[in-house]
Amino acid sequence: MELFNSNRWEGIVRPYSAKDVKRLSGTANIKHTLAEEGSKKLWNMLNNKPYVSALGALTGNQALQQAKAGLDAVYLSGWQVAADANSSDEMYPDQSLYNTESVPTVIKKINNTFIRADQIQTMEGSGAIDYFLPIVADAESGFGGVLNTHELFKHMIEAGASGVHLEDQLSSAKK
């Protein structure tokens, strides 16, 4: 399993084996192309550039403008989603009160915009802009326990997140 053989994970101790992971994975080999390709691109930038330029985006059009401006990545902030882009259509403080599907939904919208822009660019015979910027998304503190966090990460990957960060605090301790 590449996950266990890559030097990317050097120094990481796992209390389980590759065989354990394979046993829990089932037989379907599901690919999440946008997440996989984006994470490779992000990892390459993190290892080969002095910094990765990114701004927060809440809409596909904002992310599209960032790609056109030459930024390296898109950042999707949890507090911005809480305030302006959650699926409850409410304004919340940054306390993980909004629906857990909100961030994956925005990731999907941004990636759908990138896909459309790439299709138009290809149809017009141009290829000057790489619209598939990696999306780094805020998972807050996981919206609950281990299983909640697993489901959130799964949905973020399915939506095409390239990187996810998790706050090192209990949801109940958020200020």
Where are these regions (language model features)?
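Alpha/beta enzyme core
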Residues: 2-175
